[in-house]
Amino acid sequence: MIQIKSTTIFKQWLDNLKDLRARAKIQTRIKRLQMGNFGDVKHVSEGVSELRITEGKGYRVYLKNQNGVIVILLCAGDKASQENDIKKAKALAKELGV
């Protein structure tokens, strides 16, 4: 089983997500990540990947996979904020040293 860690930024974003159906889908995708099923994931850059959830606004969860053992959920957003979210995820990864 893969260990999943989350930043405070990601946890707050998910807790404040008003779209309950999307929140449930994101939580299900995270459970699948734990089992090793990454599904629709795209490499963005600098080791950061984008987990795409096709629900509501088209949500994205940005993560860093460390040797397939630990996945760190950095931040998230929707298709509209994608460009800024990628920059934020890369900065968080550098800040965390991952």
Feature-to-residue mapping (PLM):
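Membrane-interface junctions
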Residues: 16, 54-57
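A short, surface-exposed loop/turn module that caps and links secondary-structure elements
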Residues: 28-54
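Arg/Lys-rich, positively charged N-terminal/basic patches that mediate binding to nucleic acids
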Residues: 1-21
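Conserved catalytic core of Hanks-type protein kinase domains
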Residues: 16, 32, 64-66
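Internal, well-ordered alpha-helical scaffold/interface segments
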Residues: 8, 24, 28-31
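Enriched for short, Lys/Arg-rich terminal
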Residues: 3-4, 23, 38, 56-60, ...
